[in-house]
Amino acid sequence: EIARCRDHMAKLQFNDAKVVVYGECAGTIQGQIDTPLAHRPRFLEPAQWQAYGARLNSFGAHLKSTYGLTLAYHHHMGAYVESPQDIDQLMAVTDPHSVGLLFDTGHAWFGGAGDPVALLRKHMARVVHVHCKDVRAAVVAQARNDGWSFLTGVLYGTFTVPGDGAIDFDAVLEALHGAGYQGWLVVEAEQDPAVAPSYAYASKGYATLRGIVERLD
C-alpha cells in the first residue's frame, strides 16, 4: 500500500498539501446499488479495532515523516467507520500524531449523529479537514426505514449542499471558528446532476458558507 501511493503522495507534497484524505475501501458497499446499508462491514471484536488502528498509525506516521502529510480519515456510509460509535472507536485506537479526522457533516448525520455539532466538538482536536454536506432529513429517514443502499439514497437525494437541508451550518462553523480551525471547508454533496445541476448547487453551498464565515469574521 505504501509503495502504491508513493507517486500520489509526492504530487501532494510538491503542491504543498497539508493533508491526504483516506477513505477505507476494503469491504465497503458504498458502490453496490443493490446492497442495503445494513449489510456494511463491521469490526465486531476489540482486537479487530486495535489491529486496524495499528495499521493506520503506521501508515499515518509514514506519510508524516516522509511527505509531511497528515492522514485525514474519512468516516463514510457503507464502510467500517460509519456511526458516531465507530468514530469514537477509531479515535480511541489511533495516535493523534499520526491519524487525523476528516469530519463530514452529512455522513455524520446519516450515520446516526442526531447532533453533528456535538460529535464535531467531541473530536475537534483531531479534525484536520472538513466536508460540508447537508442532508434532506425526510429522505435519510426513508433510506433507513426502507433499507436502501448508499447509491439509492444518493440518487433519491439524501445529500445536498449547505443551506439546502437540515444541518445547522451556522453552528458547525461557529464550533470550528471557536476552536481555531485553519483547514479546508469543502462543499460536497453526492447528488444526481440531472436533478441537481452541479454549478447551481455548488454556488448555493459556497454562498451559504461564505455568508457564515463573513459574519464570524
For every predicted segment, state its role.
Residues E1-F103:
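Active-site acidic/histidine proton-transfer and metal-coordination neighborhood
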Residues D16, N57, A61, P84-V99, ...:
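Histidine-acidic metal/acid-base catalytic patches
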Residues A79, A108-W109:
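Catalytic P-loop NTPase motifs of RecA-like helicase/translocase cores
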